């Protein structure tokens, strides 16, 4: 029973501290934290992600700290920082802000920022020019052609470079199709959802690190 409040108390104490700071304009829960009901006695959570808008401060500052086993990941943004992130169509920012949970909002700006973020997110990233797309294709093509002669490399090095270039190819797929590039740890998960056929080709590469299989992925995309 003692666990009831433990997480809620820690959460409440830290969020209250942030809200009561005179410099704070708005506080949001983002990531998986936004769907959690912290008042439940058996709530399970390891980390709490928070966005804070401030009057004065750096454009963006990230502070990580641990309190009673719970990790807080707090991103502070100044007014200028928020404007800049929106005008740069910064993926991580609009993705989180589009459905952030509002905990505090001194100047009633949340609905506007959330609307703008949602629109940017749905429109997708800035479109690349044909020149840029063609450069990506050539650049990656040149990299992987180095791997043609397997015997030139140590086994470990060959595997390492194959994985490295495979990642470049996958990012290239998102770029040339004018899609948002997911974070590294979400790259394969999103790819599987977007294009299962391509995902299957990608997962075959690591079965035997065959050059032809890497080339198949490249040719499928480009």
Task: Identify what each model region corresponds to.
Residues 13-15, 27-29, 48-52, 72-74, ...:
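Generic hydrophobic secondary-structure signal
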């Amino acid at each position: 029973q003692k666990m009831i409040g433990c997480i809620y108390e820690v959460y409440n104490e830290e969020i209250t501290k942030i809200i009561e700071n005179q410099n704070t304009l708005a506080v949001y829960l983002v990531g998986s934290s936004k769907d959690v009901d912290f008042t439940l006695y058996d709530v399970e959570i390891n980390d709490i992600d928070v966005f804070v808008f401030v009057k004065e401060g750096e454009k963006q500052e990230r502070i990580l700290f641990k309190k009673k086993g719970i990790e807080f990941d707090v991103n502070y943004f100044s007014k200028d920082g928020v404007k800049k992130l929106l005008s740069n169509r910064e993926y991580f920012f609009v993705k989180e802000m589009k459905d952030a949970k509002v905990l505090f909002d001194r100047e009633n700006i949340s609905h506007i920022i959330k609307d703008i973020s949602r629109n940017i997110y749905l429109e997708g990233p800035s479109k690349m020019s044909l020149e840029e797309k063609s450069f990506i294709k050539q650049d990656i093509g040149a990299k992987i052609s180095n791997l043609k002669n397997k015997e030139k490399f140590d086994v470990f090095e060959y595997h390492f470079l194959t994985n490295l270039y495979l990642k470049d190819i996958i990012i290239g797929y998102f770029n040339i199709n004018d899609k948002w590039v997911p974070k590294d740890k979400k790259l394969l998960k999103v790819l599987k959802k977007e294009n299962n056929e391509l995902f299957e080709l990608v997962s075959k590469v690591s079965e035997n690190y065959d050059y032809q299989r890497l080339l198949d992925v490249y040719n499928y995309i480009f």
